[in-house]
Amino acid sequence: MYSFPNSFRFGWSQAGFQSEMGTPGSEDPNTDWYKWVHDPENMAAGLVSGDLPENGPGYWGNYKTFHDNAQKMGLKIARLNVEWSRIFPNPLPRPQNFDESKQDVTEVEINENELKRLDEYANKDALNHYREIFKDLKSRGLYFILNMYHWPLPLWLHDPIRVRRGDFTGPSGWLSTRTVYEFARFSAYIAWKFDDLVDEYSTMNEPNVVGGLGYVGVKSGFPPGYLSFELSRRAMYNIIQAHARAYDGIKSVSKKPVGIIYANSSFQPLTDKDMEAVEMAENDNRWWFFDAIIRGEITRGNEKIVRDDLKGRLDWIGVNYYTRTVVKRTEKGYVSLGGYGHGCERNSVSLAGLPTSDFGWEFFPEGLYDVLTKYWNRYHLYMYVTENGIADDADYQRPYYLVSHVYQVHRAINSGADVRGYLHWSLADNYEWASGFSMRFGLLKVDYNTKRLYWRPSALVYREIATNGAITDEIEHLNSVPPVKPLRH
């Protein structure tokens, strides 16, 4: 048996856009993502699936059913977000002292008068409904992490189709410092309205995915799909500023911890000669971001500077982890190799002979230990595993995946890392962004026609873990690689 500390919590994470819609009156058409997945050109190009989020699992209307199942599973922690566009569907007056010509946003003035002014523009029906959802969550004894941003931006801040076509004269999302100002105001306002129900805050989920896939990995089908290294750097610079200003805004109304949730891969060398490639990949993909919001070190243009207004803007780290990335040293740097990690054939085996998921992601649980211990050794900030899961409709691999990754969290804790919870992705199947409904990550299977939720076998395994606070002897055999032979037929 592998027992966890009594204070450790098992739970789940989910996102508004992916889960909320699907019942009458739940539609939220005022976001960049909604416009993006409905765009006929995106569909024709195969950038998006053609599945529509308004046909989703229906959490907005059926949240009590979701919470009932979580309670039966013995879960004790949840991470949800408020959809910005539901609260402010229409443009707000420009912030005071806003100067778009300034690249650096070192302060966003937020006071009670400003919050009251924002309150006049807020959608009270949406606010009240979120309060009902969060109150129901808390009434079941769940610890609650409220995340401010899980990818969709209000349309009045980002028109992704215009940007995709090269028109930057309209709302341009994270390319504009206006979005930095507005995100700080939004985050402070949400904390002001919901602080009585919240235990901890996160500013953002996976900002590196937004800046990376939106402007570099444009085949992924993420908005705005405009290929430009320069614009990717600008977006990430503004996202870092937005996190820091949101941190300040939340802290102006709350004393509770504020973290950020980041997409992580475990970088592994192809051979022993490729360790330098691992260090380079970690710096490029992880440390540069956290050094900015913890140490204030950031690159502006070609110059590395220290900004005190960015320093120390983090209380905890949310670790999202699914698989690894194998890297190889080259003359000019390094390359990521296909056939491993995210770059595998679906429902097959990787070049290492490890099984792959419906998404083509390699089974590699030891990478979670690698990521957790490296964060701890570098920053000594406490952590949650805020996403970990697998696209596996048949639920063949998920029981193995679940137990094997929870075991790696146990290893990390025993090695000294301060990890306080494991939040699986996700409780139920949901809308997997550009891939639509084809990728099913849920412990609960969703019938999208009836909205009924069914328990997969892995949900029973997770209940065993959560209710005992341990990987019990009865399920310890699942801490292993799933047999791969059936996947070859």
Curated annotation (Swiss-Prot):
Keyword Zinc set for record: no
N6-methyllysine modification, residue list: K116, K135, K273, K311, K332
Lineage, top ranks: Archaea, Thermoproteota, Thermoprotei, Sulfolobales, Sulfolobaceae
Marked site positions, Not N6-methylated: K76, K102, K124, K138
Residue ranges the record marks as coiled coil: none
GO molecular function: beta-galactosidase activity; beta-glucosidase activity
InterPro entries in alphabetical order: Beta-galactosidase, Glyco_hydro_1, Glyco_hydro_1_AS, Glyco_hydro_1_N_CS, Glycoside_hydrolase_SF
Family that this chain belongs to: Belongs to the glycosyl hydrolase 1 family.
Subunit details: Homotetramer.
Catalytic activity: Hydrolysis of terminal non-reducing beta-D-galactose residues in beta-D-galactosides
Enzyme Commission no: 3.2.1.23
Gene Ontology BP annotations: carbohydrate metabolic process
Active-site positions on this chain: E206 (proton donor), E387 (nucleophile)
Enzyme class name: hydrolase
The protein's name: Beta-galactosidase
Keyword presence, Hydrolase: yes
Keywords: Glycosidase, Hydrolase, Methylation
